[in-house]
Amino acid sequence: MYGNMNNGGHAPYGYNGYRPSGGRMWGMSHSLPSGMSRYAFSPEDTDFTSSYPGPSMNRRGGYNDFSGGGGGGGGTMGSMNNMVNAASTNSLNCGGGGGRDGHGGGSNGTNLIVNYLPQDMTDRELYALFRTIGPINTCRIMRDYKTGYSFGYAFVDFAAETDSQRAIKSLNGITVRNKRLKVSYARPGGESIKDTNLYVTNLPRTITDDQLDTIFGKYGMIVQKNILRDKLTGKPRGVAFVRFNKREEAQEAISALNNVIPEGASQPLTVRLAEEHGKAKAQHYMSQLGLIGGGGGGGGGGGGGGGGMGGPPPPPMNMGYNNMVHRGRQNKSRFQKMHPYHNAQKFI
């Protein structure tokens, strides 16, 4: 094993190899933190064995070799193509087909985003959960590429749009290890989703997701909805967000439902774009702080108009120079008081 090395065939410095008479496996003999065994890094401790049919796993000190090609870009866990679930023959691809933004390579109708995942949930568990709906192209949990820490959300791309729709209806809102999953369509960024999210108020306090679909579903495809609930009671607060697939659908819903009393409600709905609601809320908050107001007016004999932060600020004072002059005056007066003969003529 070590015959080609210039150390007489012995193990390299820093390692204890297999002994002819039997004994311990090799381990690092360098100094380790107190309380940790020098043989804690034995290859047997990190040797993985496959419990499911799939790619061959070579022993490489804890690293697994996964055969098969991965997709281009966006895979934070690398290419894990051809990992097969024990109860299925469909491949689990945790890195293939990813885009630059990490949203996966599926179309908008098949690619789902899953939020609020348990921190200890694995890709295999996620795959097994969604594979019950239908065949999956890609499935991956987004993690920190250095630490492997889960960010708590994942992307699942189905082979068929009908399966993605059934996954939203069946798995959205289920509880996994005290975490309530949120399953919805993964939306691309940029201008394509602008002006599609609606902010709805004055809804009945007994509103449900199905009733919200009945009210808004006739105007277009709803890709995401969220009914705000009271944190203590869990009951609806009469406020919801509804996101459509196209901005034209959102505008049609605004025109048809704004200031209209739906069935089961006692007051008219207020339906507007969520972006406008956010801007109005921010402007109201700024006005409460007095940061938005009338400009300062000048006038006549120095009569100044008030309001807000009107008028330019005064020019900054040269504080450094003023402090130096003041300090010099202080020292001079103090010196004169301490030495009464300061102004006396010198004696020769």
From Swiss-Prot:
Major localization listed first in the record, in broad terms: nucleus
Residues annotated as transmembrane: none
Top-level division of the source organism's lineage: Eukaryota
Pfam families, per the entry: RRM_1
Residue ranges of the region described as Disordered: 296-317
Any one GO BP annotation for this protein: alternative mRNA splicing, via spliceosome
Compartments where located: Nucleus
SMART domains named among the record's database cross-references: RRM
Alphabetized PROSITE patterns for the sequence: RRM
GO molecular function: mRNA binding
Protein purpose: Unknown; apparently not involved in somatic sex determination.
Protein name (record): Sex-lethal homolog
Annotated organism of origin: Ceratitis capitata (Mediterranean fruit fly)
